[in-house]
């Protein structure tokens, strides 16, 4: 994974933002930190359906059984939200991902109430897709 903060630092940084404009800019910055996705990984198998933007997420299990996530989107805010999700699932096994509830983290960040309905649906689609694929790997 690219140089991203851990869960606790993400929450600290997010709460230090003075307003929602700063928070959106921080989310976009997180997306910019994601590693470049290989062009051949932008394929139908990795496409996340249910997002208005184009979104691709690749999951691989490393030698230690930890899931490594990579992704990309054609929308900066969506790519940033993807980075937030990747931070929350960082260093987890497939089974950990299946059982981990991201919603309390989103509540702490007050994220859901500040996203448009289409962004919220896209975020949910990303989470559902990651959890579904993790279930097949666990």
Swiss-Prot record:
Gene Ontology cellular component annotations, sorted alphabetically: cytoplasm
Domain of life of the organism encoding this protein: Bacteria
UniProt keyword Phosphoprotein present: no
Keyword tags: Cytoplasm
Main location group: cytoplasm
Active site positions: 51
Pfam families assigned to the protein according to its UniProt record, in alphabetical order: SufE
UniProt keyword annotation of Cytoplasm present: yes
Annotated GO biological process: iron-sulfur cluster assembly; sulfur compound metabolic process
InterPro entries from the UniProt entry: Cysteine_desulfuration_SufE (IPR023939), Fe-S_metab-assoc_dom (IPR003808)
Functional pathway: Cofactor biosynthesis; iron-sulfur cluster biosynthesis
Location of this chain's protein in the cell: Cytoplasm
Gene3D superfamilies given in the database record: 3.90.1010.10
Family the entry assigns: Belongs to the SufE family.
Entry function: Participates in cysteine desulfuration mediated by SufS. Cysteine desulfuration mobilizes sulfur from L-cysteine to yield L-alanine and constitutes an essential step in sulfur metabolism for biosynthesis of a variety of sulfur-containing biomolecules. Functions as a sulfur acceptor for SufS, by mediating the direct transfer of the sulfur atom from the S-sulfanylcysteine of SufS, an intermediate product of cysteine desulfuration process.
Quaternary structure note: Homodimer. Interacts with SufS.
Protein name per UniProt: Cysteine desulfuration protein SufE
Organism: Salmonella choleraesuis (strain SC-B67)
Lineage, broadest ranks: Bacteria, Pseudomonadati, Pseudomonadota, Gammaproteobacteria, Enterobacterales
